[in-house]
Amino acid sequence: MYKAFLIKYAEIGLKGKNRHIFENALKDQIRFNLNKLGNFEVSREQGRVFVECPDDFDYDETVAALQRVFGITGISPVIVINSTDWEDIKQEVGDYVEKFYGRKPFTFKVEAKRGNKQYPIQSPEICSKMGAYLLDRFPELSVDVHTPQEYITVEVRNKAYVYSNTLKGPGGMPVGTGGKAMLLLSGGIDSPVAGYMISKRGVTIEATYFHAPPYTSERAKQKVVDLAKIISAYTGPIKLHVVNFTDIQLYIYEKCPHEELTIIMRRYMMKIAESIANRSKCLGLITGESIGQVASQTMQSLAATNAVCTMPVYRPLIGMDKQEIIDISERIGTFETSVLPFEDCCTIFVAKHPVTRPILSVIEKNELNLSEKIDELVKTALETREVITVK
């Protein structure tokens, strides 16, 4: 039975003198994800992270938890051989093959990695010796070095490890290594995926949600909390800022041309989100927009929205088709929650014919109709926001 996992990573291994920072962040995230499942030992050795499991661990739960750790590219369940004696290694590898494959015929290739450079047998020799031993012990097997049905890998370090299967990890970079940003989170399909995608690059996220009671219900708010909880399985705890946007929305509806409602409301959402982001020491805003998907996501509309911000706005989905976004949302588990029929404030007061090519100077001129009252409403919205830690 497997008692350990060998964790592989790619990009982290290309780092220079600060590589240990990324490796330690990866170890910390692995520990965090596994902590509630039992007492796992996580260690780092020569370009690998090893996870040693308690006797009563659940294999499927452990794999699922590891597959939610950004930075991991591969997860190999391994048999640990508490010896580097060649005869012991041969015997254990043979027993492994017999236990997991029985006596059925298949083609194989032995691969070897010699992390312990003091070990007297070099990697090519390990491969040839082990292949010969397995052919002698299991005559029904045959070697195919080009297209084998199975790869049998032996790694020799302070101990020896054998494995033949590598499960795919999510890739990316460990959360916390890429700064912090503020996600504009709604109850739709796109923004949760944007949060997932930016976190995959190592960015820690907080989130801002614009609530508009009584036009949006408590169930709509709970839907967003639920989405944040799903994302937090990948990102770690998320601080969710819930902003009451009702009075601002009604005032804009009263004072501004209706075809510009969406753009102007989006501009004020960005202003508020940026203010919260600055207070939280974030380095940018994250949105789930992709070019041309709706009227507020044309290049002209995005430029008009961006114009109110001084910090960078990152849009991880900008060049993706809707189906690509849906596919990711289904894979990460947010889709079924996103399609629940509770309206966001973005879907209320939508104009029949919204402007798709807004002219910034015109938008700014029409915003003058809002006078100083809008600043008071924004201040109140910021001061009365609710902060929820979701995990």
UniProtKB/Swiss-Prot annotation:
Pfam family, one: ThiI_fer
Biological process terms in GO annotation: thiamine biosynthetic process; thiamine diphosphate biosynthetic process; thiazole biosynthetic process; tRNA 4-thiouridine biosynthesis
Protein's UniProt keywords contain Cytoplasm: yes
CDD domains, per the entry: PPase_ThiI, THUMP_ThiI
Record pathway: Cofactor biosynthesis; thiamine diphosphate biosynthesis
Entry's EC annotation: 2.8.1.4
Predominant location: cytoplasm
Subcellular location(s) per record: Cytoplasm
THUMP domain ranges (all copies): 60-167
Domain of life per record: Bacteria
Sorted UniProt keywords: ATP-binding, Cytoplasm, Nucleotide-binding, RNA-binding, Thiamine biosynthesis, Transferase, tRNA-binding
CC annotations in GO: cytosol
Residues binding ATP: L184, L185, Y209, F210, R266, G288, Q297
Any GO MF annotation of the entry: tRNA binding
Catalytic reaction annotation: [ThiI sulfur-carrier protein]-S-sulfanyl-L-cysteine + a uridine in tRNA + 2 reduced [2Fe-2S]-[ferredoxin] + ATP + H(+) = [ThiI sulfur-carrier protein]-L-cysteine + a 4-thiouridine in tRNA + 2 oxidized [2Fe-2S]-[ferredoxin] + AMP + diphosphate; [ThiS sulfur-carrier protein]-C-terminal Gly-Gly-AMP + S-sulfanyl-L-cysteinyl-[cysteine desulfurase] + AH2 = [ThiS sulfur-carrier protein]-C-terminal-Gly-aminoethanethioate + L-cysteinyl-[cysteine desulfurase] + A + AMP + 2 H(+)
Role: Catalyzes the ATP-dependent transfer of a sulfur to tRNA to produce 4-thiouridine in position 8 of tRNAs, which functions as a near-UV photosensor. Also catalyzes the transfer of sulfur to the sulfur carrier protein ThiS, forming ThiS-thiocarboxylate. This is a step in the synthesis of thiazole, in the thiamine biosynthesis pathway. The sulfur is donated as persulfide by IscS.
Family listed: Belongs to the ThiI family.
Entry protein name: Probable tRNA sulfurtransferase
Source organism (scientific name): Lachnoclostridium phytofermentans (strain ATCC 700394 / DSM 18823 / ISDg) (Clostridium phytofermentans)
Gene: thiI
